[in-house]
Amino acid sequence: MDYSVSFENVQNSLNSLSSQMKELEQRREALIKETREVISLCSKAIILLHGDKVKDAEALLNSASSSIKKLKDYVICDLDRYLWPAEQEYVEACVLKEIVERKSFLSGHDELNVSLNAYVTGLLDCTGEIKRMIYDNLRKNNHGYSLSLFEIMQSIYNLVYPFSFYDNLIPGIRKKLDVSKRMMEDVRITMTEEYQRTMFLNEFTSISERR
């Protein structure tokens, strides 16, 4: 007995899949293109913050925030991972701004309206900018403030460290923690040397004055 099969339902399903894939690809390309602009805005804001140009940096971060909100409309299925790099850079810049402004509290992911994954990795990236602030302040002999910044850097690392076990769920977190740890060691060595140098100079000055 002859046997034939209708592939109408199969074809309909594949047509739906094709339409879905085309839409996903269009959204993915839009996300990749637009997130580059957000990352650029945040990078420029970070440079301005290190130059104490907080208002100018704030304007760029406001633009970045607006762009991120619009980009969330492109996110369907698992495309949110293409938004993470932009959110991560945004978190890094915003937290740095709050530290530069000496705010009493640092924003959480809800306040910044970003994903938790991007928030935690952005925090770790910010430790690199804090390191730069520490070195800048050491050169200005702002030792007390440098120590405060180091404590902030260390606190961020200690708070995030327990999540190193979720490296398979938060891509790159373990590597970022390793980088952050090395930076803290570098800063600790530099600050110890600077402290010893200062103590020596103070002692030398004291001896010279007694003569």
Positions of the model-derived regions?
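Long amphipathic all-alpha helical oligomerization modules
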Residues: 143-211
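Long, charged all-alpha helical bundle/coiled-coil segments in cytosolic proteins
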Residues: 58-113
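Amphipathic, well-ordered alpha-helical segments in soluble domains
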Residues: 13, 34-37, 41, 60-63, ...
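Extended intrinsically disordered, low-complexity coil regions enriched in Ser, Thr, Gly, Ala
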Residues: 15, 46-70, 138-167, 171
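Long, charge-patterned amphipathic alpha-helical coiled-coil/hairpin "stalk" segments used as oligomerization
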Residues: 98-101, 105-157
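Non-transmembrane, amphipathic alpha-helical segments
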Residues: 6, 23-34, 49, 53-56, ...
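Extended alpha-helical coiled-coil scaffold domains characteristic of the BAR superfamily
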Residues: 35, 42, 83-101, 117-124, ...
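Leu/Val/Ala/Ile-rich N-terminal alpha-helices, chiefly Sec-type signal peptides and the beginnings
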Residues: 2-75
